[in-house]
Amino acid sequence: LVSKGAQRIDAASLDNAQGIVSGESDVTLSIAGKLDNGQGGLVSAQRALSFERDDTLLNNAGGRINGGSLLLKGASLDNSDGQLISQSRLDAILGGALVNAGAARLASGGDLLLRSASVDNRGGKLVSQGLLEISAGSLDNSASGTLAGQADMSLRLGGGALRNQQDGLIFSQAGALEVQAGSLDNRQGTLQAQGDNRLRIGGALDNQGGRLDSRAGNLDLQSGSLDNGAGGVLNSAKGWLKLVTGLFDNSAGVTQAQSLEIRAGQGVRNQQGHLSALGGDNRIVTADFDNQGGGLYASGLLSLDGQRFLNQGAAAGQGGKVGAGRIDFSLAGALANRFGQLESESELHLRAAAIDNSGGSLRALGRSGSTRLVAGDLNNAYGVLESANQDLDLQLSSLANAGGRILHTGNGTFGLDSGQVIRAGGELTTNGLLDIRASEWTNSSVLQAGRLNLDIGTFRQTAEGKLLAVQSFTGRGGDWSNDGLLASDGSLRLDLSGGYRGNGRATSLGDFALNAASLDLGNAASLAGGANVTLGAGNLLVNRGRITAAGDLVASAASLNNYGTLGGGG
């Protein structure tokens, strides 16, 4: 049936299999029942092509339907291995299913608006050169199916499922993509937009091995849960990524954006995963965050509010890694960083019920600001806590530092309770002031400070113990026994109401002063000053070791027994 003018067909049914219905003007088909255009059939119009009845059962399997513009109404459409093409706008309104599977192609040169009970596009192509809008109960674009639009795309499925697994592609070339569905299966599939990519998924979003991309816009995701494991990718190359979900699983996956806002009420799993932000402030609110063997990075602020943060490993080098411009964690539970790494380019603030940094490292590299740890227990055994910030503030119930190092290279306050310092063990170093007060202390650790002030009633230092000062060392107390090292690169002054004894060394590069009720120096003991040395003993001064001064040496005592060396250079 071929016409040069307008053509209209009204029938109860039409069998056009292997046939032709064609017009050089408008063509209108009003078919009450089945319209069969399969097996190479052709229906075409150079101008408007209209299927105007809602009850048409249209079979275009292996057939061709072409129009200058196309309005398609019907009960259902089977376009398997067929072609349905409009040179401009295409409107399709179906009460039942659209099947566009296999080698099928459904395309428009302008906007494409489709409404259907369901869409089966497995292996098919559904393409618009303009706007693409689909409203359906469900949509299956799996098995290398393609949904593509030149401009904005909108997929509205209500509570129905969107299937895009097995190399399915949903792509907005120059616009935004908006998806609303009950669930989304995007395993090994791709949803991509040049602009914003906005997904509202009521239930599970499975992106294992798949990609959710925004090339130049933002990635805005809401779902009941999100599985981005097994090499899945969430990518907002030039914009932010916002995620609101239940459980967010990024195990062995990649999530990256310019900035991140993640709210995962049931937790985040990032084992062997990569989660990063290239700039801006970033916030994560969750339950437990499992980063074992994973990487969490941000160029700007990384703020995390949650229950536990699990960053530990079984051995050195196997823990998780966290790096950010600034780190601020607030945890109701524990921070587990055994063999893990947390590093801030500026400030480091951690609040947790307990912190386990055994074998791990906590570092703040900025020269200003503060490092602040607020916790019940801090276990830093064989670990490293290092801060270049102005101030280091440790608010702890207990500190275990055996074999560990706490290093503060800033010049401000070293805030740690004296009781924690004397019980900690390991090495403690600060360029600032370290003020220790205790009634009794036995030291076998290494402590270093810019300025070291001690007020200790009874002090014992083993041969392994070292107390070191860069600028000044000031000590007060009762009875002191020193078998280790007391040293200052500046001045050193000790004022004791009791005695000073032992086989240890006390030395300064500047002036040295020691006043005590008595002095009893063993064979291996030494007192040495790089400038003047002043010694005062209210009672007996016994020297079996060495007492030397680069400048003047002044010693006064009620009684002096010298079996060693007394020497001054002044």
List the model feature ranges, each with a label.
Residues L1-V2, N16-S22, N37-V43, L58-I65, ...:
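Short, T/G/N/S-enriched strand-turn elements that build extracellular solenoid repeat scaffolds
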Residues G5-A12, S25-A32, V43, R47-L57, ...:
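Well-ordered beta-strand segments characteristic of repetitive beta-sheet solenoids
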